[in-house]
Each structure stands twice: as structure tokens, then as C-alpha cells.
Amino acid sequence: MRKSVVVALLVAMVATSCRVLLVPDPPGPRSHDGFLPSWYWEARQSSYLDYASTQFSAGSPTNLIANAEHSRRTGAPFNTAGITMADYANSFSRMDNFVDTADFDLTYIMNLWYGYRDLLPADVRAGIESHMRSFKYWFTDPQPTGTIDQRYYWSENHRLLFHADEYLAGQAFPNDVFSSDGNTGAWHKARAHDFIDRWLTEKTKYGFTEWHSDVYYQKTFDALLTVVEWVDDPALAQRASMLLDLLLFDMALNVQKGNFGATHGRSYMKDKSKATDEDVFNLNKLLFDDTSLPYDNTGDPGASLMARAQKYHVPAVILRVAQSKHTTVDQEHMGVALDAGAPVDHTQTGIDGYSFTDPQNVEFWWERGAQTAWQTVPLTLDTLDSTGLWESDFYKPFKAIADITGGDRVAAQNLAQALEPMLGFALLTAVDTYTYRSDSVMLSTAQAYRPGKFGEQAHISQATLDENAIVFVTHPKNEPQSGTQWPDDDGYWTGSGSLPRAAQHGALSMSLYAPVFASPGPPLTAFRYLDYTHAYFPQERFDEVTQSGSWTFGRKGDGYVALYSWRPTHWRTYTDPAIFTHGLTQPFDLVADGGADNVWLTQVGDAQKFGNFAAFRAAVLANPVNVAPRPVAGGLPGGFDTSYTSPTEGTVAFGTTGSLMVKGVETPLNTGKRFDNPWAVANVGAQQITIADTAGNLKLDFANVTRTASATRRHHRHGPKDGRPGGGNR
């Protein structure tokens, strides 16, 4: 009788949720209350603290945090005398001179001060406190005469970092008058409270603007954890914990052997060519323990802050997601749909209540890189006029728009719309991401994201087999650059001169390149692109690489990848020692000459599905790729119609325009879901999100600001008992 009732309940659950809960594989540490048990989590924290404390870097606040926490836990000596004002002279100078990213410095120094100020020498402590009261916390605050503010306040991560910094400074010194603007600390705390509230509300509704970023998720993580650990408002701290859960869930869904190798809203070649270059690597290792590679930064911000965290507790289900060996698909929708290429329509006044003209919404639109969208150009110009930001390095180029149009806002809107494929280079609009992952390989794509347009930092698609074996394609803006590292502005591998129209279904991704603008001359040479596309396919990081016709195949362990190019390819030879190659000595740059338009296909597989590598290659080659170029239109490539019968997906057809067809059935690129995967299905803007498997769940109720986790009584890997009661609300 009991068995039949249980079966009936399970059937009802499946019918209601339209999904079957996964049995965790591996099972993970036994959880009694839905959160990671303290014995396990403290061991993970210690794994980083033990490593970080092998070095003492007095000028690194995050390394000092790790050393101080290690000392607190183990009784090891802490070298207070080794810290001097000279160690912080550069950070203080950056703050005093309005240098960009000084908010990063202040966040880490603020965490050091809040957690371990009693260990700091009196003069260093006083210097920190003085800068907490003198820092300029927002772009609308007074700027000293004769100085230029070079800070960027408006990206997703910067916004919350500035607001958290301001809140904590005001919280620490509520009655003091801040020299930056003459307001009290209490005033600053109240303003920051409202800013943080707005930011949290936006993320709850829209998800993360800088989607899956292997660079900036670390900064957003740092800001959220800072709010959780130190802000004295319980509701703000709880909401930040809940968004931190979603950020880590996002990372867990898109990590493969320590590599956050998904499509990225913002990334750089210096961060994405291998896992240990990613800003999130040490944090991922601490959290998920899914790579054998060692920690590699004794002052890593994310890992240092997480290794000393006391108030934030990691839900056990998130670890199980990251470590899952199941073959799964995750589809996500994030961001705000702003079409800056649509015809100018002055009856459009805003989106979802966010006005295009209200000065209170500057940070909302600028976070999304919409400074040059025709909808917000008047607001941008008005803001630059009123704040004096024209002189900053970032906004100087925008002066050309104002000069060309003589300050006429309508003319500026028309110009912005006409040049949108170029001027929208930094736009972060709504995105639909698709990630296929097995135990041996992962493939991830941003579906049909701004096709044909210039992309400054967007990373559209990638196959990831392990920490180092990855494959991706870009349309280069410039030839390879010399130097001792990949430059931030390396347009050869970072971003794309034009973004492809890409679509993924299962283990197959198609990327169709067809620029919608001609490579320009002066004064728009910053938007030039080269007449070819290419792939990053580092041969020495694979166990095998072989080619057959238009296909290039790679194997790493039991993971397989096949890359197709419609245009003929060749391996670029690097003979100039001045060109940075990150130590690669074997070919890694697969170039497809002949035009900026091309069709690239990526098919992945593994030994579990295909058996050996030869069988995978034979299956991929069994059917031809059919590519039909469309006629040239207006001197620009017309694009393509492409079809291929995949060994895993059947016949898939996709074009430069039109629907994705799978086995003759139209397949939407947008599911309308914030999350759609085996652990969570939630609509965009959902106020309740449940992340679950058969071992337990996490329930987030943003409407009521509750965060509850639970564990089912199953057979898990055992460790010492936690002593915590079952069920948790933290």
C-alpha cells in the first residue's frame, strides 16, 4: 500500500512539473538540511585558505583576508607588522584620482576592514577609514574642479560594487560628514539601500545582463557576497543570498571540469583560452571541486571572500548540479529586449516601466550598453552634458555624435539608428542561451544573438572538453597583436567584427556569418573587420586532432568535437616571436579565407554515445553538409541556408533568417523560460524558483523573501554529522 501511494505521488509530481527529477550522480556529501554540511564546506574553505596562506602579500587585501582567516581558524601567526601604508599607496591613489575600477579596490579593502580591522596597523586602518569617507560613490556626486572622473559606474558588476561600498561606509560612520559631498554616512547608507534594492529587483526579474561571464560573474559574486556578509538590513542580505544562489546555479549548469566554458555576454581572450585564465577559476574550484588542477592565485578575490564567508551557506543541490555526470540540456533567458535597430518611433517611451528619458533610469540603460541606442541617445547626451563626463576617456568618442548632429536630439537618434550595427557594439540585450553537457564534453551557444552586427566582447559559442581543450569561432577585427599577453582590446580573438546567427539543438551548433554592414573607413575605422573568419582549436591541448575534407576533429579523453567550415581552411603559422601565443607551439588558429561570410558547424559527442573516436568521425562524415549561399544584396553577403543530418539530432536546417527546423519541425530559439533544465523550470520574471533533484531542493520565494532548502533521506556519501536539524531557511 505504501509503495503504491509513493508511486502515485511521484506520477502526480511528474505530471505537474513535466519533468523527472534526476538522481544525483555522483551523490555528493550527505546533507541533513539541504545545505552543504559544515564538515564538508569547512574543508573546502580550508583547501583554499591553506593554499593562499603559503604567501603573504601585504598589498593584496584579498590575500590578507585569506591569511587573517587562516590565522583565526588555525592559530597560525599573522604578520601585522608586515603591513604598511606604502602597501596601499597605489590603491589610495587610484581612489583619490578617480581611476577606473577603484571600486574593486575599495570593495576588497572594505571586506578586510569589516572582518579584520583589529589586525591592521593604526595608520593603515586610519587611511582606509579616511578613504571610506572621501570616496566618490556615484557619478552624479560632485567632481573636484580640475579633475576628470575616469570611472565606469554603470555595468552590472560596477553598479552593485559601488552601492555595496557606499552602504558599508555609511553603516560604519553614520554620523560623520563625508568629504566627497558633505552628506552624512547615514544619508549615504539610505541612498545605497535604495540603489541596492533596485539592482536586486532588476536581477530577480531579468536575470544577469553580463550572461555567463567568466570575468564579471566574479565581480558580481564579490558584490553580492559583500552584501550578504556585512549589510545590516536582513531583507537586503536575504535577497542578495537568493540571487547569489541563482548566480552559482548558473555557473554550476555551465561548468565542465573546472572550465566555465559557456557562451559569455562579456569575455576577453586573456580570460577564455583556458580554465586557469578565467577570473572565476579559483572560485569554481573552491565551490565545485571538479578539476584536478591546483589553485593558482593566492589573492583571488572570489575564492578569498568565499573561503571566509560565515553567513552565506551553499545549497547542496547546486554542488550536485555542478558535479552531475548526466547528459543534460540547459536553456536560459536573461536580459531586456531592446531593439536598437528598429525604425525610430517617438511613440515608444520605455520598456516595462523603465522610461527612455528619466534620469533615474540612466544606470538601468547604461548597464545594458545602450548609450548609443536611438531610444536612449537623448538621455545619454543630456546626462553627459549635466555631469561633465564628456571629458572621460570612455565618453570622448561620443562627442562625435553630438558634433555631427549639432546637438539636435532627433538627428542624433536617426544617426544612431542608421549606424546601429556598429554603434551598438557594447549593447547587451536579451539573450537565450543553450548548453548541452555530458560527462565528457559541453557545447554552449547564444541563440541568434545580434546576428551580423559588431560585437565588442560577446562570445557566442564554445565547445569545452576539459580545462584546456576548447574550440570556438570568431570573425576577427584586426590581425594578431604583439605583446606579452592577450590585450584587453584584442579584436583578433575577443568579440567579433560581426556576430554570427547561431543556433544550437542538442549536441549540434550552427553559426552563420554574414555581416550586415560593410567594413568602414574613416571616421569609423574602429569598426573595421577582416575578410575571413577563424577558429581557436589548440592542437596540443587535445589527445588527437585530425582532418577530413571540411571537417576538423578533436579528442580529449572520452570527449569528441567536430568542426565544419564551408570555406576551405588552413592552419595559420606563427613565426614572429613578438606575437603572443600563450606558449602554444603547435597550430591553434584555423583560418577560413575568402570572405567574412561563412558557415561553421560544431558537433560534439563522447565515448558513451559513439564508442571510439573513429566511430564518431565516421558518424559525422556519414552525411554531407548542404550550404546554399543567398544572393548578394546591396553589396553585402546575403547569408546562407544550411542543413545537415546530425548523428545525434537528425536533420537540422537553419538560415541567416527563418526558423530552426529539427526533423522538419519548427523549433523555437526562445522557450520563454528563465530556466529550463532538469533541475529547474521557471518562467521569465518568476517570483518563485525551485531547484531540485531526488536528493533535495532549494526553494526561492522572492515575493516573500524566503530561502528554504531541504534534503530527502537517501543514501549519500557519508561524513561526520553536522548537528544541524533537518530543513533550512537561511
Predicted regions and their residues:
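Extended amphipathic alpha-helical segments with heptad-repeat/coiled-coil character used for oligomerization
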Residues: 225, 234-313
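Charged/polar, low-hydrophobicity segments characteristic of intrinsically disordered regions
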Residues: 99-111, 139-154, 198-213, 246-274
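Contiguous, well-ordered alpha-helical segments that form the cores/surfaces of helical PPI scaffolds
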Residues: 69, 107-111, 160-172, 218-230
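Internal, well-ordered domain-core segments that constitute the primary functional module
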Residues: 186-254
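Positively charged n-region of N-terminal signal peptides that target proteins for export
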Residues: 1-4
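Hydrophobic helical h-region of N-terminal Sec-dependent signal peptides
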Residues: 6-15
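Ser/Thr/Asn(+Pro)-rich, low-complexity disordered segments
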Residues: 13, 25-161, 174, 183-196, ...
